[in-house]
Amino acid sequence: MSKILVISGHPNLPDSTANKTVLDAVKNHFGDAINMRELDKLYVNGKFDVPAEQKALAEADIVVLQFPVYWYSVPGLLKQWIDDVFEYGFAYGSQATALRGKKLLISATAGAPENMYRDALPYELTTTY
């Protein structure tokens, strides 16, 4: 079986509904076959344990980034993790091989009132001058 690494990028997972539900379903389905990394618990004293995070990535066959969409982007906590962990020489560069051949899955949640999910937006996003 493939080794699956799930990165939870929610900055406050205990107060989440959708993200917590997704992660609970993944845990129940895959059990011990996954390595679940909850970034809100791993970000201690303003930093990540970069070698430990890189080791988890290197050992995985499949990497899942699970997060809520905030302002059309990932939460700041996940952005910080990406910036810290995906270093030159590890994640990119001519000598970087740690992530080669791995599969990436993005699992993103978004929330808005029901009336926002329709064909036409409730307001114009662009203006012609």
Write out the residue ranges for each language-model feature.
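Short, basic/glycine-rich phosphate-binding loops at helix/coil junctions
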Residues: 4, 34-35, 112-116
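A short beta-strand-loop structural module common to alpha/beta enzyme folds
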Residues: 32-44
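Generic recognition of short, well-ordered alpha-helical segments
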Residues: 17-21, 48, 76-80
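N-terminal beta1-alpha1 ligand-phosphate binding loop
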Residues: 1-33
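Hydrophobic/aromatic beta-strand patches that form the interior of the parallel beta-sheet core
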Residues: 5-7, 35-37, 105-107
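Short histidine/acidic/glycine/proline-rich micro-motifs that form metal-
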Residues: 11-14, 41-44, 122-123
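Helix-loop-strand module that forms the ligand-binding subsite of alpha/beta enzymes
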Residues: 51-129
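Structural motif
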Residues: 43-51
